[in-house]
Swiss-Prot record:
Residues in compartment: Cytoplasmic: 2-104, 126-178
Name the UniProt record assigns to this protein: Caveolin-1
Non-traversing membrane segments, not crossing the membrane: 105-125
Modified residues (N6-acetyllysine): 5
Keyword tags: Acetylation, Cell membrane, Golgi apparatus, Isopeptide bond, Lipoprotein, Membrane, Palmitate, Phosphoprotein, Ubl conjugation
Gene source species: Mus musculus (Mouse)
Transport found in the keyword field: no
Region annotation (Interacts with SPRY1, SPRY2, and SPRY4) ranges: 149-160
PTM-bearing positions, type Phosphoserine: 2, 9
Amino acid sequence: MSGGKYVDSEGHLYTVPIREQGNIYKPNNKAMADEVTEKQVYDAHTKEIDLVNRDPKHLNDDVVKIDFEDVIAEPEGTHSFDGIWKASFTTFTVTKYWFYRLLSTIFGIPMALIWGIYFAILSFLHIWAVVPCIKSFLIEIQCISRVYSIYVHTFCDPLFEAIGKIFSNIRISTQKEI
């Protein structure tokens, strides 16, 4: 193994491999291999969802959390029969629960489809139209900003500096006459 050449068991000569540590995608180095296996990429399309906590970012805490007590309340001194109050509570709660389930069954998947398309369009436009347009504008505006900077430093700075020197020697004194 001298001069950058390797000899295999059959006596054939070959050049030094480009990377002796192994394949750049599957390293032979054990420590390197452990680092690669530790870094797992999580795909947003295959992640598991939490069926218990369905609002982990608390988007709807102050808007949708409406209970019976938030909508219907009887002030002190004006109470209906206890049975009516219990039946009203049960009716409200069960109706809200099942009607929400019915609406989400009928409209949930179509609305998810519509919002998925909408946000896909927004993402597409942002990635392929908005950001390139802004970058293009910033590149084009640099030329104008350089010309403007030269104009300001050449004409405006000396003019305003001269005006400042003229007015810097003006002294105002006030006197009170009684």
